[in-house]
Amino acid sequence: MSLGMMEEEDLAEYFRLQYGERLLQLLQKFPNVEEQSDSPSIQLLEKKKEAKIMQEAMEHKKEAFQRRMETLNLRWEELGIKEEQLKAHIQKFEQFIQENDQKRIRALKKANKERELKRLRLRELAKAKQEMMALRLEHQKLSVKLQDYAIFNKYLEKVVENSEFEEIHEVIARYKTLVSMHHDLMQSAQEGQEKIERAKARLARYMEEKDDEILQHNNELARLQMRFDRARSDVIFWESRWAHIQNTAAKKTLLLGTIKMATLNLFQIVSKQLKESTQVSLEDTHKQLDMIQQFIQDLSDIWTEVKKKEQQQVRM
């Protein structure tokens, strides 16, 4: 709001408090100027002089009022600056909330990806267990076969004599081959078991790390939610304050318009009573008030003189 608007508004309020309804009462109370045309001209000049003194006093008051309005205008400009700062703060905070929402969405996507990876590792672990069970079953079968072969050791010696084996070392070589196969199978089974144990350990560590990350993300989300709630409460509060300021400004603007209309009506009545053409603009409320004040002062002076004259005539 500019200084001119503030000055007109407070000036209207000032004269409304100073005079108020007394303007209309004085206009109704004083007789028509034409009916008092027989007042002594000398006394009228003296009253004019007194009115001039009163006018100078009013000018001093108006200067003091002008200084007060300048101070109020500075305060109003400071409020405007604070309002702009508040808007900038709200805009930055909305941008901050939007960025945090994007971070939260990325965190949720990452958590979903980690859970999917966890399910994949569990499936791999189940598959490794199945392979381990198959290796153990194969190992059991080979052990049974080995025992069966041991039972027929002596039989094999006899078989050498009556079989394709020409020497016993051929049977032993065959036995060593079977032992080597058994060893390879046992080693494969052990490597499979170790692989399963390592996979279990990695899975346990991975699950523990991801549980910690999920807990941290949940704590961060809770903290951001609290900040968002506080910020939303602040936004609602300042929106309410801004609406109140706008409503107050609208009411004061309406009141100022009403006062200007009343001042214009009084000015037109005064101009009609004076029967003089004036060059005062319809928008110049200050000059209108000055002329109204001068007219009221003149009427007051005339009325006082008339009363004195009537009292003197009554005494005579």
Curated annotation (Swiss-Prot):
Regions annotated as coiled coil: 43-150, 182-236
Role according to the record: Essential for male fertility. Required for sperm development.
Deleted gene: phenotype: Mice develop normally without obvious somatic defects but males are sterile due to malformation of the sperm flagella. Sperm cells display defects in the number and location of the head-tail coupling apparatus and lack flagellated sperm.
Tissues where the protein occurs: Expressed in the brain. Expressed in the epididydmis and testis. Expression in the testis appears limited to adluminal spermatids that are engaged in the assembly of flagella. Strong expression is observed in the spermatids within the lumen of the seminiferous tubules in testis from 8-week-old mice, but not in cells adjacent to the basement membrane of the tubule, including Sertoli cells, spermatogonia and spermatocytes. Expressed in spleen but not in kidney. One study did not detect expression in the ovary. However, expression in the ovary was detected in another study.
Family: Belongs to the CFAP73 family.
Protein name listed in UniProt: Coiled-coil domain-containing protein 42
Listed PANTHER family: COILED-COIL DOMAIN-CONTAINING PROTEIN 42 (PTHR21683:SF8), COILED-COIL DOMAIN-CONTAINING PROTEIN 42 LIKE-2-LIKE-RELATED (PTHR21683)
One Gene Ontology biological process: centrosome cycle
Cellular component terms (Gene Ontology): centrosome; manchette; perinuclear region of cytoplasm; sperm head-tail coupling apparatus; sperm principal piece
Entry keyword annotation includes Coiled coil: yes
Subunit description: Interacts with ODF1 and ODF2. Interacts with CCDC38. Interacts with CCDC146. Interacts with CFAP53.
Subcellular location: Cytoplasm, Perinuclear region; Cytoplasm, Cytoskeleton; Cell projection, Cilium, Flagellum; Cytoplasm, Cytoskeleton, Microtubule organizing center, Centrosome
Keywords annotated in UniProt: Cell projection, Cilium, Coiled coil, Cytoplasm, Cytoskeleton, Differentiation, Flagellum, Spermatogenesis
